[in-house]
């Protein structure tokens, strides 16, 4: 990494113009390997002919030698089309090397954005906080802010989009023409490959073999979708922000600046609609939430501008039905595995003034989060832990494992699920999921040993109970021994948010 920074420090003002030569450097692929992505080809060599990590450097050197050859990419494309279903070595090497290049290319295109982020944090003197990376850090923010809001908009980022738009988005940041041509080559290659397997598959669906590159493109696309929100929010702010000028100096292409100028001039006349200091925006992956303390008319104006901006900027129908406006007091929204709502609690207070007494009704708002059982059962059914109705079944593909591995896998899933959903105010859904996983584990062991479930439950009842006893339950049993029994029966309503969760639970991610 130091060598990479030294290369870029030679000419920081023109660092975005010399990204393509980095593709011929061996340390770029080593750096991609060190990132530790599970989808990396270096971590899954079994899918590519049984190569191990020791031979990765040899493959990288062989790849660099081939890239120096003239018309290498043209030959690789022809080989991939001719031998796609034959299974010849030519197709194997072309497809394998193409994935290696995409891994290295993903590292290269991240360089300008990473350096810009680091310099921005240093300039604004923003301390690095790993706790803010936690998914659970979103919910305390919602509890503090959304309980005072009136309306909420559920926004689904529009898709699919044309592949050329993805290239054009990066063109405003990276002006290295060979790199953009290479990106276009990757997109069309994998689009043609996916179209032969599933004709209706869009480039929006990420390839398992190139997750890093496609996640980067998707994040770039989402940041462009949020451009209107950031632009209007900063325009309507009472105090001008220091980073506002960066958005006006952006380079736009193919005449689309004309649409933006028209929209910007039109926005100047309607900015009074958006002068709302209580506007809050939260997004995770493809779903966003926009909350406001204003009126329903203001939320409709926001929706209108979102739809028009996306339609003009991306030249496709932006699907207005993907934005739903609801009154927060009468609406529960599903976000990251939690069903959240604002509860209104009323309490009667008796006031005494001299000889007169009267009763006042006081209403308080509380942000509540619960775990819905139906999505969890549906997700568990997809993972083959239970039926659609929630009846536990055996995990047949795990019967070849040892008993210890089977119990550890089920226990780890149960602990992760309880850990992620520890912020729920009601624990009945978690206890039911724990029962499903525990009985599914017993059925898997019974199927492996060709025995009955009852015999295994009698033999391993205490062991399974300890394995499925979660960490927070153990802590609560030590701190509050008297309430542990109530907690196990679902009466404990204390919510716990963890600031070390940077990855969503697999059962929630399948929804």
From Swiss-Prot:
It is found in: Plastid, Chloroplast. One of its GO terms (biological process) is RNA splicing. GO terms for molecular function: RNA binding. Its main location: plastid. One of its GO terms (cellular component) is chloroplast. The keyword tRNA processing applies. Keywords: Chloroplast, mRNA processing, Plastid, RNA-binding, tRNA processing. Usually encoded in the trnK tRNA gene intron. Probably assists in splicing its own and other chloroplast group II introns. Belongs to the intron maturase 2 family. MatK subfamily. This is Maturase K.
């Amino acid at each position: 990494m130091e060598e990479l920074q030294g290369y870029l420090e030679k000419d920081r003002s023109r660092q975005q113009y010399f990204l393509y030569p980095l593709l011929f450097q061996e340390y770029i692929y080593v750096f991609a390997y060190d990132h530790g992505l599970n989808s990396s080809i270096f971590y899954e060599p079994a899918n590519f002919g049984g190569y191990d990590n020791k031979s990765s450097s040899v493959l990288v050197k062989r790849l660099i030698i081939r890239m120096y050859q003239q018309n290498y990419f043209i030959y690789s494309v022809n080989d991939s089309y001719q031998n796609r279903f034959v299974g010849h070595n030519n197709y194997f090497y072309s497809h394998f090397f193409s994935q290696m290049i995409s891994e290295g290319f993903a590292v290269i295109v991240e360089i300008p954005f990473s350096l810009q982020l680091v310099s921005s944090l240093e300039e604004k003197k923003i301390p690095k906080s790993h706790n803010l990376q936690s998914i659970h850090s979103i919910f305390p923010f919602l509890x503090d802010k959304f309980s005072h809001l009136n309306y909420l908009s559920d926004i689904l980022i529009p898709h699919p989009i044309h592949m050329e738009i993805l290239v054009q988005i990066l063109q405003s940041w990276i002006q290295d023409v060979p790199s953009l041509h290479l990106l276009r080559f990757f997109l069309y290659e994998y689009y043609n490959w996916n179209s032969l397997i599933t004709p209706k598959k869009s480039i929006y669906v990420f390839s398992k073999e190139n997750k890093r590159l496609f996640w980067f493109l998707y994040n770039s696309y989402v940041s462009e979708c949020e451009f209107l929100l950031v632009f209007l929010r900063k325009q309507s702010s009472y105090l001008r922000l220091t980073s506002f000028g960066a958005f006006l100096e952006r380079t736009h292409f193919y005449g689309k600046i004309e649409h933006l100028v028209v929209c910007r001039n039109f926005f100047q006349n309607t900015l009074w609609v958006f002068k709302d200091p209580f506007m809050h925006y939260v997004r995770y992956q493809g779903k966003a939430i926009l909350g406001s303390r204003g009126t329903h008319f203001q939320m409709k104006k926001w929706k209108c501008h979102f739809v028009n901006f996306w339609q003009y900027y991306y030249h496709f129908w932006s699907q207005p039905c993907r934005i739903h406006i609801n009154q927060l007091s009468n609406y529960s929204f599903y976000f990251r595995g939690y069903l959240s709502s604002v509860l209104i609690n009323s309490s009667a207070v008796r006031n005494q003034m001299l000889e007169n007494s009267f009763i006042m009704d006081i209403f308080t708002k509380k942000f509540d989060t619960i775990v819905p059982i139906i999505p969890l059962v549906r997700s568990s059914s997809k993972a083959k832990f239970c039926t659609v109705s929630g009846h536990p079944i055996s995990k047949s593909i795990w019967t070849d494992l040892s008993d210890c591995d089977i119990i550890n896998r089920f226990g780890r899933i149960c602990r992760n699920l309880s850990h992620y959903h520890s912020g729920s105010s009601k624990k009945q859904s978690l206890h039911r999921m724990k029962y499903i996983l525990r009985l599914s584990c017993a059925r898997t062991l019974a199927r492996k040993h060709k025995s009955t479930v009852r015999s295994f439950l009698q033999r391993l009842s205490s062991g399974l109970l300890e394995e499925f006893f979660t960490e927070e339950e153990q802590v609560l049993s030590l701190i509050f021994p008297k309430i542990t029994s109530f907690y196990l029966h679902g009466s404990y309503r204390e919510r716990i948010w963890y600031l070390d969760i940077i990855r969503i639970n697999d059962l929630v991610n399948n929804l």
